[in-house]
Amino acid sequence: MPTTATKLKSKPKARPRRPALPPRHPRRTRDEHAQEIAQDYVEIIAELIAATGEARVIDIARRLGVTHVTVARTIQRLQRDGLVTSLPYRSIFLTESGSKLSEESRTRHEIVVQFLESLGVPDRVAQSDAEGIEHHVSKETLQAFRKHLGRRK
């Protein structure tokens, strides 16, 4: 029978090794995050234009819970990327590219929400969760969501 001293000296069982995750490249991560932000902004701009006829920096800031300075900087980047147009102290408008991205983002969001609701997730929660999920779903997964939703009808 082992003594207490030998029990303390015994080595703990080795845990099985987890497979190594593929490396994440910081530049890729930054680019993906920038794309998420662009999608959120063009979606909000489209919603504001549809609801009030214009999208102002202050309205976007309120919707996102950020400062007007943050919005102004992001709008400059979106202008550089050809997604929005604006004049100083004027409303912000979507370009053709911005409108297309907005529509794609809105459709993606709706599919994710419908999929979550089909699993029994309440609407309020599905809307909130979709905001985080929609940017990270591959085209293949989105197509699988559509297929699943089509079978339910």
Model-found features: residue ranges?
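C-terminal regulatory/oligomerization modules of transcriptional regulators
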Residues: 1-18, 128-153
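N-terminal helix-turn-helix DNA-binding core of bacterial DNA-binding proteins
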Residues: 24, 28-66
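N-terminal positioning helix adjacent to the helix-turn-helix/winged-helix DNA-binding module
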Residues: 37-40, 56, 97, 108, ...
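Residue-level recognition of specific faces of alpha-helices
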Residues: 44, 74-77, 83, 97, ...
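Canonical helix-turn-helix DNA-binding module
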Residues: 55-92
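Residues within the alpha-helical elements of helix-turn-helix
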Residues: 63, 101, 118
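Basic, amphipathic "hinge/linker" alpha-helix immediately C-terminal to the N-terminal HTH DNA-binding motif
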Residues: 90-109
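Arg/Lys-rich, alpha-helical DNA-contact motif
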Residues: 105-140
